[in-house]
Amino acid sequence: MTANGKGATASVRRLGVARQVAIEIRKGRRKRLWLICAAMLGVLLLWFGYQSARQVEVTSDYRVLLYSLPTVNAVFLPLLSAVVTSTVCDVENRANMWKQLLTMERAEDLFCAKWLTCALVLAAVVTAEVTGASAIGGALGFQAVPASEGLVLWVSTLAVCLFVATVVECLCLFVANQFVPLVVGVALSFLGLFSMYLPAYVSVFVPSSYFGLLSTVGMSYDSATEVITWSTVAWPVGYFAVIVLVTVAAFALSLRAFARKEL
């Protein structure tokens, strides 16, 4: 095949994935996916606002916001990520339409399209969350969050959400009962309640703990004076690399397994 022929084939495949993503987004609208995300995000921000309103009485340091938000994320976002992914995959599972779809689409394209759809939805959710949290902090009287630190928070949060979504998509595509992926999301959210209190050598094995592990804010408490001191720490690139590598590995293995799956 000539270079032009290969380029044309690759272009067609990219267009195929793009069309499939557009179809998945339309399916999500019919399933009220955006409404579900908005409701869960609203509860998250209400809880965050309640906690922040109590803390602003002690200090207006913006780092309080950057410390508190990952704690809330560890509880809410694993479940939200699981709900998004399960909803995107649920239509085909309920109607047992995989065989019909794979007569029109390559298995790899279908898998990637569903993953990209989840990634786009989660990116929108995380963007709305970080923007909303910053606005709440400003309204309560906290210092403005620097754009660079807000960006790091956005990248860190999305990376963990995508890891959860990748694992849940694998479960959705290989397990007919969609209750199982949701149980995984609930379990990760439950573990998120305790993730900030686990020793580092334990928390690295808990996916929801990475919301806190990737934080750029440190906190120290002086029991004698009962004073909390906030500090900025270097972004833990090592933890970020771990979550990215594990996500890539899970994606590659799931993609290969789905392409070879007997339907």
Regions found by a protein language model. Give the residues of each.
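Transmembrane alpha-helical segments in integral membrane proteins
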Residues: 80-92, 169-179, 243-260
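Helix-loop-helix units of permease transmembrane domains in multi-pass membrane transporters
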Residues: 86-120
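Cytoplasmic juxtamembrane interface segments
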Residues: 10-22, 88-99, 163-191
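Aromatic- and glycine-rich beta-strand/loop motifs that create alpha-glucan
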Residues: 1-38
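Secretory targeting signals
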Residues: 40-87, 112-178, 191-193, 225-237
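Membrane-helix boundary and inter-helical linker elements of multi-pass secondary transporters
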Residues: 30, 103, 173-174
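Terminal transmembrane helical anchor/hairpin motif
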Residues: 3, 14, 51, 55-64, ...
